[in-house]
């Protein structure tokens, strides 16, 4: 996959040349192209912004440099998606990262200053926001989104399961992790993780994911589609967290049918 970023500050993207993204580029699993759209400004002083019509605070990005920069992109050999990073856009979530991971090229337009000339919006296929807060520019948001998408690509993490088990990948928060030593300052690793019993370990992890999501992110828990095997785990959680009982109707249909007597 190719990530193309239109930005006024390409030097801010040093982190994409470290860690997992660095290895992914070395293995030619991803490509990162940084384009300073100031280079496409036609004025003598390379101005990319101007005062807003009608007055007001701040400066507004001019349309000409970004239109020129996008038109100068080489043809994409596959499917290209152009994303305008904007606080007015759809809030970025894991499902969006999964959707984007199926494209061949993502082009991020990073804003700065007070905002964009409205005509710039016509360049994008979609507008996306990192969250309901305001950043100085789109660069940090672009890096976060690139990381979230890249780790879903085959071979980037090394193990497909690593991405599949991450928080939010299945609508649930991730289960707790432990490593050596088995006891640290009186805090012990759960016995089940030391048992070597793979089915019990998987059940424990699923139960803890359900627990964490219910306690920490009830908004996510309200959207979870439960599996057939979740019924007993959820009933156990009700005994530990009685307030969960009010949700029981959501998984009652998963109750195992009583075995017929012969």
UniProtKB/Swiss-Prot annotation:
It is found in: Cytoplasm. It catalyses: guanosine(37) in tRNA + S-adenosyl-L-methionine = N(1)-methylguanosine(37) in tRNA + S-adenosyl-L-homocysteine + H(+). Its main location: cytoplasm. It comes from the Bacteria. Keywords: Cytoplasm, Methyltransferase, S-adenosyl-L-methionine, Transferase, tRNA processing. InterPro entries: Alpha/beta_knot_MTases, tRNA_m1G_MeTrfase_C_sf, tRNA_m1G_MeTrfase_TrmD, tRNA_m1G_MTases_N, tRNA_MeTrfase_TRMD/TRM10. GO terms for molecular function: tRNA (guanine(37)-N1)-methyltransferase activity. S-adenosyl-L-methionine binds at residues 111, 130-135. Specifically methylates guanosine-37 in various tRNAs. This is tRNA (guanine-N(1)-)-methyltransferase. It comes from Desulfitobacterium hafniense (strain Y51).
